Amino acid sequence: MIIENNPATKQQHDDWRLRIKAEFSDTDFSVSSDYLCLIHYLDKAPQKFYSREAFKQYLTFLESVKLTDPKLLADILIEAEPLLSVSNRILTEVNDKPIHDTFLPKEHNDLINFIDKEIHYNLLKIYETPFFYLSKIIANYHWIKTKKATDGLDLYNSVEQLKKVGFGFVDKFYLHDVRNGIAHGKVIFTDVDITYIDKKGGKANIPTRKIIDTLDGILDIANGFCLAFKVFSLTNSDFFETYGIQIPQSILLEELQAKANGPAWTITNCLESVAMQDKKQLMIYVKNDNWDYSKVHWYSFTTAM
């Protein structure tokens, strides 16, 4: 493809592909060259600290079920696609926040203010969107196989199901009482710990700094799950095409950015829309700092390709 031969980025992209293949040596990348967005899990923090256990277990599940129950897996992924796209976008937003690998406030009052403003809010976002909807794919499959109605498959039940099928490591970082206290109840700070009270009066006491470790841990797991889903979706094009599964739009945007971004040219978003006569179109938003019209023309063409 022309876009892959952009002289400004070709050497870098070739290097990325070599490094990605080396990092995920058990994966066959021969079916497509569209996997450059995975470089974030090698170079960017906190993505590069993803849970290796979560990644391996999740990818093993997807590959296994693709062989044993392809139609059921396809149905689950088709239904989940819009929320998986939102989940990936929210996970990226939390990953990009300047709250990771930073010095914590030394004064206790400053620390609990940081926890209240940054940790609790982002912990709840991770629990309720990327962690939940990525976990729900696995739980949904097992509930359907055991003929359980999936209407009641909420976050708590999804986690309980995961713990039964080899994902027990999530129990350390999914704290249900903490989640309920932040979302629906009350949070009380003391000099040594934090008390989370849910709407029914249940309480959980957590050491102050442990809640920061909890965010780090659940973020690493969510990143591991999301990475596994990206590897699976970007290397199983035949399966996706056969069953009409759409790769979540936010993942496609990441791949487009990884491939088409260049010096003074940054893709910021893309949206599907309907033009006159009900014709579908894709609007791509770009931040351009080029003054040379020929460069703008080149990048516009290669981005559209």
Task: Please describe what each predicted stretch is.
Residues 1, 163-165, 238, 251:
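Extended charged low-complexity segments that act as oligomerization/scaffolding linkers
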Residues 1-110, 243-305:
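Extended intrinsically disordered or low-complexity regions, especially N/C-terminal cytosolic tails and loops
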Residues 63, 124-128, 180, 212, ...:
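Generic structural signal for well-ordered, non-transmembrane alpha-helical segments
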Residues 86, 129-136, 177-188:
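Amphipathic, heptad-repeat alpha-helices with coiled-coil/zipper character that mediate oligomerization
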Residues 106-109, 154-164, 201:
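Short, charged/polar, low-complexity loop and linker segments
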Residues 113-161:
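Short, contiguous, well-structured surface segments enriched in hydrophobic/aromatic residues
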Residues 166-197:
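Histidine-centered, metal-coordinating catalytic motifs and their short helical/loop contexts
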Residues 195-246:
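Amphipathic, Lys/Arg-enriched alpha-helical patches that create a basic surface
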